[in-house]
Amino acid sequence: MAEHPTQFRDHHELAKLPWFDLEGGELVVDPSIGPAIDVHTHLALSYVLPTRLDLNREWPRTEHYLPLERPLDLDVYANRNFSAEDLKRLEKDLTLGAVTASGMRRTHTLPNLAREMRGLSIKSSVLLAIDFALLSDNAGEWLAAARGKPEFVVFGSVHPYRPRVAAQLDRQLALGARGIKVHPAVQMILPQDPLAMRLYRLCGERKLPVLFHCGPVDIEPPLGRYFSQVRHYRRPIEKNPDTTFVLGHSGALQMEVAIELCKQNPNVYMEISSQSVSNVRKLLDEVDPTRLLFGSDWPFYHQAIPLAKLLIATEGREELRRAVLYDNAARLLGLAPSAA
């Protein structure tokens, strides 16, 4: 098995890996690698005011939160690649920018995501909405924007403290939602909060998987870091055996604890975005291979970053690669199996 570099001067140097190339300055992958399903993406999030962005507008260049010209290390947790200035811009774009139609977020649209997907043989991307109890409807706006676009699967968002939670779930389900996203650090709620526990039960009754942001990432505010501690997810998982849970980022910086949760509970999947090459290898070796999912956290990161990590980690293990890239997610989401 060949040794591959994991450190690059910029994102475009990923083309040094045997699976990638550059076409017109854009990273592309050997088509034989696909298809893939990315279960962890976002569009521009809007709060307080309805979105002022056109989510169906194409921009010439996507402004990822980790700029493409930034040096890239694949064998650290992904956010370690941010500079201090990158983090300042990210925070401003996600807070003050969330009420505007400007900033980096204006490029976080369906056509820009679709363009990246095409070059990387990603057949489907799951859009993960995040909403507050009041003053946001990202789920409704994304469901409307993605209507008639089969390459996109939308996970809705219902804050546990929102009135008429069951009716809101049914509304989003009727509009095409295929699951629900829960982000304790952003929504400011403990995973085991009684109202959150009710939400998980209702999701299980409707066969809607719950994708958690799971684990601390060390760049969030202290309270958000506390809410994301993996120990807080045990009770929701164990008390809702009929609900399927996906641990986004595989527990982030507490991956070992998340691995044990997955081993002990058959209703848990692990999603690998942001983990290092070494940690992806560990997940492949220790977790049930039918419960591992590929994800990117676009637009924080270019989709080629986690793809490169997985391709390095699965070299010589093509059946496992196919399962993680596509088959496991297709089965979970009810999508067509791959032809491979």
Protein language model features and the residues they cover:
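Active-site gating/metal-coordination segments in enzymes
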Residues: H12-P18, G119-F212, P216
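Ligand-binding grooves and catalytic loops that recognize ribose/phosphate and carbohydrate rings
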Residues: A167-A177, Q187-L199, V217-E220, Y226, ...
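Active-site neighborhood of phospho(di)ester-bond hydrolases with catalytic His/Asp-centered motifs
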Residues: A36-T41, L127-L128, F155-S157, K181, ...
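Histidine-centered divalent metal-coordination motifs
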Residues: H40-S46, H213, H249
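Conserved, mostly hydrophobic/aromatic
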Residues: H40, M117, Q172, I180, ...
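Acidic-and-aromatic substrate-binding clefts and catalytic sites of carbohydrate-active enzymes
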Residues: S102-T107, D131-D137, H159-V165, Q187-P194, ...
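Catalytic pocket-lining loop regions of alpha/beta-barrel enzymes
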Residues: A15, W19, R178-V182, I189-L293
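Mid-to-C-terminal alpha-helical segments outside catalytic/metal-binding sites
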Residues: M1-P35, L49-M104, H108-R115, P289, ...
